[in-house]
Regions:
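N-terminal core-binding DNA-recognition domain of tyrosine recombinases/integrases
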Residues: 2-13, 23-39, 48-145
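A detector for short, charged/polar N-terminal pre-domain segments
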Residues: 14-18
Length: 150
């Protein structure tokens, strides 16, 4: 559970409760064991909740007309995470790019969240044997020319 409080937005780092248990455990691991900042852990948490919503919609676990933000990200177990394929990840990246309008850098960060989560499930807690994100590379970033001050 995050102990960081943002005085301007007190609910931002509230205890991580509206996600699947594996995600909650992973976010706690990030903060306590991996030493990530509260902001980093919170961003990974949001990314993984978004992926949970996407997968619930993709697998038909919610009505097709359900509003994306209204999909409950809870209720997914370790067996569900083990059923995710590389194609599911590719579809999620496509969704982020086309439907959500994410830039390549945002898509890459969300993919990094998934890489970390699956690395945790496979290598840290040994709950899964396969990582569907292992062979997926982040999108190629646009080269930005430096802006010189005159």
């Amino acid at each position: 559970m995050s102990i960081y409080l943002d005085e301007r937005n007190p609910g931002k780092h509230a205890p991580f409760e509206d996600a699947a248990p594996d995600i909650v455990e992973y976010v706690r691991y990030l903060e306590v064991i991996a030493g990530k900042s509260a902001n980093t852990a919170f961003n990974y948490y949001c990314d993984l909740r978004s992926f949970s919503r996407f997968m619930k919609r993709r697998r038909g676990l919610v009505p097709t007309d359900a509003e994306f933000k209204e999909i409950d990200p809870k209720g997914l177990d370790t067996a569900f995470w083990g059923s995710i394929t590389k194609e599911d990840i590719y579809e999620y990246l496509y969704f982020l790019n086309r439907e959500c309008g994410n830039k390549k850098s945002s898509t890459a960060r969300r993919l990094a969240s998934l890489h970390g989560f699956y690395d945790y499930l496979v290598n840290q807690v040994n709950r899964l044997t396969e990582d569907p994100t292992a062979a997926i590379r982040p999108p190629k970033q646009d080269k930005v020319l430096p802006k010189y001050l005159t």
